[in-house]
Amino acid sequence: MKLHIYILILFSIFSFIVPMTVMATEEPKYELIEKSGKLELRQYQPMLIAEVLVDGNMDQASGIGFRLIADYIFGNNITKAGNSQKIKMTAPVTIEPRSEEISMTIPISLKKNSGRWQVSFAMPRKYTLDTIPLPNNKQIMLRKIPARKVAILEFSGFVNEKNTASRAQELLKWMDKKNLISTGSIELSRYDPPWTLPFLRRNEISVGYAKNKAKEF
């Protein structure tokens, strides 16, 4: 009985701390244009990202890409003063396919056993390309993304290639009903540390969008 109560107390504390930790993490700024349940249209401000290209399937690429960029932000870098500097962790961690074989048609498949993936972190807003420390690992690239409009589907739970493709399909169908077309690759973003309980996790499928002018006539 005591053990049961102890577990419940730990669970309650953990459930409280994890969301608070995520809330304290800096995220890219955006304006909410429209919301329908878990589906949203957003206008993102320009942002600076650190990215790396990784070969393999989605799970392999996510792990390798995360470790490479984490190594950079934890101090494997050089400033203009010649020293290293830790960069504050941000959310989310994003992965997207970089294979010409993946199209934006329905049904969509993100299963690429020998594909190439881009894994990226958004950098803290205080940095610019001129002020951010440079990575010592030449695999890591720094890039500024311009302001853009993005369609989003938020979901919780574990992430795998099958449910990611299913969510992407759901998002594209919703966009089609709203007379919107995709303008880039499907992206998967994860906001939480790996120890977060599945039902507390925040994941997002996203893609840039524009009006489908062909259907307006």
Segments from the language model and where they lie:
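A solvent-exposed interaction/effector surface
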Residues: 2-217
